[in-house]
Amino acid sequence: MATLRVLPEAQAKVDVFREDLCTKTENLLGSYFPKKISELDAFLKEPDLNEANLSNLKAPLDIPVPDPVKEKEKEERRKQQEKEDKDEKKKGEDEDKGPPCGPVGCNEKIVVLLQRVKPEIKDVIEKLNLVTTWLQLQIPRIEDGNNFGVAVQEKVFELMTALHTKLEGFHTQISKYFSERGDAVTKAAKQPHVGDYRQLVHELDEAEYRDIRLMVMEIRNAYAVLYDIILKNFEKLKKPRGETKGMIY
């Protein structure tokens, strides 16, 4: 039978790590998770996340609306210049020039909320990773019979994986908001006479505000679900066969 020789001092280090991980996990379940559930629930009740009139979220767009007559004259001069100018390189440079307006800032109300939410996303993902590692280290050696507890572990692990995927998506969602808003602002600046582009910027802000509230709810729910399912199945998760077994890895 093949065996792997592990030095006693190496095994001792692994055992210390496992014990420390178990202690941290039990502390999370015993105090940290309930505290975060309460904090995030209170956050959801704050006025900042309960704006009834979303028009109050509008950020000023410092993009002047051009005079139609002057714009028409300017367009005619540009067309005439293009006919006279055969230098394709110069034309390309002209097209790359920025819009004739000052810098357009972010929506400060949205940014302030995201500054509060992003640390919460980072925190819940880190805590979820810790608890997931703890669960994986409770998996016993593979053998026939008495595997009901192992099946419970697998179900909880599947839930944790789904939660992790959802929470990780929040980072992409936030980046996508800024990218889409930047594109909308650029279009509004290049074509200031088109009101739809200006409105699009405000619509994106309102959509992100709703998404931020949903993010906070999902983070709170993640803590609550983890706390509930682990607490209900703690004995099966920690001792799936009624006694402590070695690691699968």
Swiss-Prot record:
Pfam families: PA28_C (PF02252), PA28_N (PF02251). It comes from the Eukaryota. One of its GO terms (molecular function) is endopeptidase activator activity. GO terms for biological process: regulation of G1/S transition of mitotic cell cycle; regulation of proteasomal protein catabolic process. Keywords: Proteasome. One of its GO terms (cellular component) is cytoplasm. The keyword S-adenosyl-L-methionine does not apply. Residues 68-98 have a biased composition (Basic and acidic residues). InterPro entries: PA28_C (IPR003186), PA28_C_sf (IPR036997), PA28_N_sf (IPR036996), Proteasome_activ_PA28 (IPR009077), Proteasome_activ_PA28_N (IPR003185), Proteasome_activ_sf (IPR036252). Residues 55-102 are annotated as: Disordered. The keyword Oxidoreductase does not apply. Implicated in immunoproteasome assembly and required for efficient antigen processing. The PA28 activator complex enhances the generation of class I binding peptides by altering the cleavage pattern of the proteasome. Belongs to the PA28 family. Heterodimer of PSME1 and PSME2, which forms a hexameric ring. PSME1 can form homoheptamers. PANTHER family: PROTEASOME ACTIVATOR COMPLEX SUBUNIT 1, PROTEASOME REGULATOR PA28. This is Proteasome activator complex subunit 1. It comes from Bos taurus. The gene is PSME1.
